[in-house]
Amino acid sequence: MKRDTEISNEVALIWNTANDVLRDIFQRTEYPDIIYPIVLIRRIEGVLIAKTEELKTQLAVQLAKVDAATQTNILNSKLLQEIKFNNISSYTMQKLADEGETSIKSNFISYLNGYTDNIKIIIDRSGIRNHINKLAEEKILFMLIKDFSQIDLSPQKVSNIKMGYVFEELVRKFSEANNAEAGEHYTPREVIDLMTHMLDMDEKAIKKGQLVTIYDPACGSGGMLSAAKEFIEEKINPDAKVVLYGQEVNDKTWAVAQADLLLKGETAYITKGDTLYEDGTAGEQFDFMLSNPPYGKSWKKIQKKVMAASNGRFDIGQPRSSDGQLLFTLHMISKMKPSEMGGSAIAIVHNGSPLFSGDAGGGESEIRKYIIENDWLETIVALPTELFYNTGIATYIWLLRNNKPEKRKGKIQLINAVDFWKPMKRSLGNKRRRIHNGIEGSGENERYVEANDQIKQIINIHKAFEEGPYSKIFDHEDFAFRKVSLDLEETDDNGFPVTILKEIAIASNKLLDIVPAKTTNDKKLLAELTNKKGKDDEYTFVLNPKSELALKHKTADRTITIRKTVIGNKLSFKATITIPKIVKDTEYIPWKANKETFLQKEIEKNWTITAEEKGYEIPFTKHFYIYQPLREQAIVVNEMAELEKENLDLMQQLGIKL
């Protein structure tokens, strides 16, 4: 892959600097807290210096006519107009290094404070100020600044796209070294490209000058947002007005996103905070949304705050507290524009859990039900494993849309793209595979080979919307099922009902229902039974077979003996009856199957339905399973005989006698 070699020099310089300067003074887990901000500051400075030199050339005649102070004012004013920031201190990282170690701490702080407020908030949230004292006390602040002043991260040397890759690779290496958890990773560029293509942006939808809004609720360093904007401007309409929105919970990652988008001159609004309980875009709706939220990550500690700030977003159902990824899906759904206003499209990456976790009536199933029955789920694409940097698990792109074309209404497409990959020339953490974009060679030999473009192949399968080896089309109800709770009557080996004795309490107001007392004798016994002045005793009656008790407990008894207990002036009644032995059972029945026929076929015993719920699950792999028949017995026997002969020959050659 071309970018693997393009970024290796910068990454190696930064990585080696971290190891050389910080080792034995900071814990390895602390390296990113220092290196990320310094990389960020060096990049910001590189953009500032490059723009300043450009302006000096453009304004050479004007600047030559004024003194140095006025020149500085003119340049600072121009910088604010063109790149929205400047630095009024007299320092750069090179000048800090040139002045030596004596005043490095105070000079560095002055340098940081010289930036405009929009950069200072990025620097503050990057966390570097928390480490300045220790860096200075350990005599390594000067070394760090000196080494980084020699690493050229200017736009002329490192393009915006390349800078994103540099940072991505640093995050991957630090995460790998620190055993970061599997869900927290960068999204590979080919996955982002596939997602943006699947959003189905086109010239008809995005007209010249039209405002297009794109949102990522877990935007990380902003890579998806930038890629989506690039896609619109390069492939669809360069004159579209694209506004980016995002939210990120991590201070340092937010700082990277904010800086990256600011340096690119993007119109972007990146809010800081936890999307689930600090909705930074409350009341907003967006045209396109894409995200790769954390999966397999517990939200138990924030559950109360999340539900308190739900504002209806999560009322439909809550997933298990051990995995909150579906909450991001619900959050994005809440940001969809109504279909009559053009609607919205969502592409989101999940692991396998949201496909099937949770029973009928549970949070995950209710969320799937909500999405499917509203006809928002358009497509799910199974991606190759070993595609992400810090995890090799199976992942899926869910495509949701509330403005489906007519042919897709009421339908869901599953695309099995697990085999659409090429091996990496060298592994990047857990990433050993990539979805090929058709670019072959590098440098002057770089060329596009359409036949090798696996992204395009997947997109074509999606657009074709046809059944095939990699594509299956389903109705909504193909993923629905009934969860039926049953009472089964146990039988013995001869098929006769197994009964047990059960003691039950009888309310006094139910006596006449249980005991009709039609005969004179029954009336007499009933009077004695209900006499509060009588003694503890028991009475046998003819049992009303249509009584609530008989029907509820399915007793076959013809009579019932009721025991009377007198406590003061109060009476209590109990009886022991013979009832069938009941076994609890649960059956899961496909929604399209006839319930009665299914139970009659599957259940031999007498059954009674006690509860029924509708659920949804998407057993993706089941629908693409290809049965491999067992080989003929004779072939297997012959192969075993041949192997045995080979073993005997080998043993004879070794001089082993049997």
Language-model features, listed with the residues they occupy:
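Active-site catalytic pocket residues across diverse enzymes, especially alpha/beta-hydrolases
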Residues: L48, I232-I236, M336
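Short, contiguous acidic/charged loop-to-helix segments that flank catalytic cores in large enzymes
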Residues: I25, K300-D323, G352-G362, P384-N390, ...
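Flexible, glycine-/basic-rich loop-and-beta segments that form/coincide
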Residues: Y389-K502, I506-N509
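Feature representing long, continuous alpha-helical segments
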Residues: S226, A255, S291-P293, L326-L330, ...
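Non-catalytic, mostly N-terminal accessory regions of nucleic-acid modification and defense proteins
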Residues: M1-E203, Y269-G280, A382-T385, K409-N416, ...
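Short glycine/proline-enriched turns and hinge-like loops at secondary-structure junctions
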Residues: R28, K208, A282-G283, T391-I393
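Conserved S-adenosyl-L-methionine
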Residues: E181-S291, Y295-M307, R313, L326, ...
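Conserved Class I SAM-dependent methyltransferase catalytic core
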Residues: E30-R43, M195, Q318-L400
